Each structure stands twice: as C-alpha cells, then as structure tokens.
Amino acid sequence: MPYDDIVESINTWKSKVYPKTTSIFGGEPLLHPRLTDIFGEVKKAWPDTTIRLITNGYLLNKMKMGNFFEHTPFEMQVSVHRLDHEHIINKNIIQFLKHYSDWKIVKVNEAGVGHHVYVWQRPGFKIWKSKFGQFVIPYNTEGNQLVPFKSNPKEAHSICGNPDVPILYKNKLYKCAPIANLLDLPNTKGFKYKPIEAFDNVDAFVKMIGKPESICSMCPESRAHASDHYAKGEVHVKHLD
C-alpha cells in the first residue's frame, strides 16, 4: 500500500483500537521504501504497542538495520520459505545481530507445524526464525474461479493459522488476511463479507476476535486441503533460482 494510505488508516483507527501487537507483513514488507517511517507512525499512534515485522529475510542485508532498533518493543519473525535457502537467511540474521553484543539465543523445540526454530533476544527486541511445513489453502476452486468452502465455521476456525489476527487493510478492519486478499481479486465469487469501518460497531468486532464466525466457513475443515510449503517448485525467489 502507498505510504500516505497507510498513514491515513493509522490516523483513522488510532482512537478506535489499541493493539498490544501491530504486525506488519505483505507480500514482503522489506520492499516498501518507507518501512521505517511506517514503524514511526505506528508508534506515534500507539506508543505502547509491540511492532512485529513478518519477513522472509532475503532483503535484511540491504536494510539500514540500525533504524529498526529505534522502535522498541520490536519483534521480527523471519519465515523460512525454502529449506535450500536457509543458509542465506541465517547469514542475513547474523549480520543483523552484529549491531549489539547482548543477544541471548534460545533454541526452541522443532517438533510440529508452524514451530519456532531459534529465538534471539535482547532488551526490547526479539527475533525468531520460523518454519511452516504446510499452509491451509483458504479457498476452493470452480474452473478458474476462487470460491469459498461451505465448512462448519467452528471446525474451520479450529485449524486456522491465524485465528486471532484481524487485519487493517485499506482503512477497514477484516476478520483475517485471507478474506481481505480474496475480496481484492477479480476471479472470486461467493465470498459474502463486509469489513468494519471506523464508524461501525468496533466493540462488537473486537469481542469476536479469536472466535469463529460465519465467514470462517469459507476455509476447509481439515488439513487435507493444505499445501506443502517446501515442495519443489512451490516457492520461487528471483535471482536465486
């Protein structure tokens, strides 16, 4: 999103919601030319919020990393998308860590899907590297159309990867990132959802965070519709493939 649109959204909502954690993700947020300015706007609106940057880590070595440490508390989740590229991500993280010498490293149990592999911590700052074996695909298909499943909302919600993460997108609040993205696409049909605007009943929306709603029926009820994250050919990286 353009920087001015992001600032407008923040200013519209800063007196309406008070997030403990504000996640910034994409796409790839490190591609945004004014990323650290966005950090500043978030902290100006919500001084006590923890900024969480979710990145694939490929561009960390090209960032002015010192600017990241000005916006604590800060977390950075580095998601590994290609096992054969993990050494590149590790190198970029190590370069980032060199800014300070007081990091504590914790190795986390590697069992399970969506686990955290390593965590680096220092006062006000945390980095973790994550691996996700599978992603549940949040739509069905009919020909070239993306259509919703007709699942039991409670069952679908029970396997959701982000069951309590609403999204602020284009100045509106959405239950989750997938529905915000799907409504933006030209080849979708059957998705019935109205996002919340600042003049709507925000309290009612907030009370349903982390709880199943009718829109959750758009996703499958089981991991049978999951995609192997590391399958050959699933993820391509420009200039590295």
Where would I find each of the regions flagged by the language model?
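Conserved glycine-rich "GG(E/T)P / GGGxP" loop and the immediately following alpha-helix
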Residues: M1-S158
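Accessory C-terminal segments flanking Radical SAM cores
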Residues: V136-D241
